[in-house]
Amino acid sequence: MTARFQKVASVFAAGMLLAGAALAASGDAALTAVTGVTVIPMDAERTLPNQTVLIAEGRIVAMGETGTVTLPAGAERIDGAGRYLMPGLADMHAHVYGYDLAEQETQDLSEVQAQLIGYAATGVTLLRDAAGTPGHFLYRERVAAGDWIGPDLFLASPIFEGERNVWDFTVKVTDPVAVEPLVAGYAEAGYWGLKIYHTVSPDVFDAIMTSAQAHNLPVMGHVPFDVGIDATLESGITSIEHLRGYDFDGVPVASLWADGGRSRERFSSWNRMTPERRDELVSKTVAAGVWNVPTLAVNRMLFDPAARAAVIEHPRFARLLPAMQEGMKSMEGLDAIFSVDSRDALGEAYPVMLEFIKALSDAGAGLMTGTDSGVPGYVPGFTVIDEIQTFGDAGLTPFQALQASTIAPARYLGIADDRGTVAVGKRAGLVLLDSNPLEDLSALWDLSGVFLNGHWHSLADLEAAMDEQSTMAAE
């Protein structure tokens, strides 16, 4: 899958670069230029001051010191003086509301549009949905066509679960023979990869990994309870979500299954992990080339009222759909999933999890930002910035934390030739900020606007779109 993505991205980028050069030469007015801006290219820890960046047909077609780049007459100009242009952010674990294709005929999709706008309004230009449905392909098409405002979507399959499934919307598989037809169907449908849950049995897990390899589909997900972290790291899985699975040591199987797999005893195991075991797990993770999407910012929402209050008090929160606001304020859905004991245990384990992230980073393991947003109570977009700041809290430098939301996801997806840095030929999924996030990660909140596939959306435009969706929902 990775090799195929890289080949397609390389050929497409080359073709679009030539097309962009032709547009610039002809003076076509369908060009946008950001002038006098400081570029944070994210190819190295550096800034490029006083740059002009020229965008056409969704690509960066020219970039250089202001005054050296010829701007065609009629090109739209955006004043970048005193501002910073960087790659757009990525949410590598999200849940956009999904429906079956047949259901979409009767569903109001304004809530979906509101979600996607919410991501864009916090600088998210790429999103990996961790539980795809057939309906998500329609959303992806509408975003790609420019009909909807939102990030580019990479869709994982519907979630594979086992006998003791947690969710009723997942695909329950107990017979390994049933796996291959499902995987073949997901590959044919165009899903990016497969998603597994901790309830999958060892024989079904093995069948999933075998079929995934045969169809060139990456596998992401939770570590199955009956497989364990060591075997999972050796299986070919590409990313582990929420750090789930590193916390199995010394926990009886019955305790792992308690509270839907979210027991106090399980989360408390973080505080019993020895430095030697931590180093062993980190080394195995690096050796296997497995990435992690920790989603720690959302864990903090569960045990830290201040974290939840910070989101609710943010000026942009009032622009969300009323249902989203109420979900965040009440956290009713999550209260039914995480017991008070398990939330307390998460709070006690949180500092150790931060240390684990730092150990992974120091060892060179792949880290990416994700939010689990779309789950009741988690607000689209907001938590991406919180997660980046959480990486900073773990001891990563601002540049390292930003990498986890820009070039790192592009490398993981095999599209680093196409995205993840600011350079000529790259896709123009970009964020324009009023201050420098390399100095302070909170600068990510100082959004001036975002380029989605080369289309400019100012913050005012994005907020107006959010207001429109909220008004429609209230009618």
Q: Each predicted region: which residue ranges?
A:
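Bacterial N-terminal signal peptides
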Residues: 9-21
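Acidic, glycine-enriched loop/beta-strand segments at the rims
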Residues: 39-52, 65-68, 379, 397-402, ...
